[in-house]
């Protein structure tokens, strides 16, 4: 039986387009509004990443850091993220949910308990930013036991030899970091160069899916039409912050924005 992630990519392949993956910090704007944001994003997205808040999100740039700070100060915790995912997955047409965050949260929750809860609420995948290969292998194995895809991160400086080891041990989906920067950084590398690196990594195992993230915006997304998928994060978080500051409804604004961005990769 194919996983929810595999079925999502299968649908994209039939439509001859990359998967659109959206990211936002769970609980931003409050639990109710956050669920509404997730529902709105998932109408256009093929997979949905949800960040779980952390006080020192070292891989994230200013836009996403603002969201982490906002959710933490409003009292949102990991249990609230699980509640949001559980409610969202009651919809039979729900998209695969990938949780993204930092290992300390998982460590304090306890690995086995955390994965059990993920499985219970219907999480399809996990990205743990500060748990690199090969140290992440025992945890990745636990994820697989719980039918949860552990996404390995591959950076621009990862050698082909190391990339081969990572891909060989990985699950069905991996994440290529586009450049040496935090999330939301301005692309310092031409999309052409990013794609050259992407194609080298993709050739290692063409069957496994590889998506591109970090620095993807409305101006650059079209360049990655031939990849397996693109991740939009900081662009979305920036719009949430702008909407909340102007006391506008982020749900309405995000729906329009993501719909327009998706048209660029069709």
Stretch-by-stretch model annotation:
Residues 31-42, 158-169, 204-205, 212-230:
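Catalytic cores of alpha/beta
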Residues 1-21, 84-90:
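N-terminal amphipathic alpha-helix/helix-capping segment at the start of soluble metabolic enzymes
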Residues 163-201, 239-244:
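Glycine/Thr-rich beta-alpha phosphate-binding loop at enzyme active sites
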Residues 200-208, 219-222, 227, 231-266:
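Alpha/beta catalytic cores of nucleotide-metabolism and tRNA/nucleoside-modifying enzymes
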Residues 15-21, 92-102, 143-153, 201-215:
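Short beta-strand/loop segments at the ligand-binding rim of alpha/beta enzyme cores
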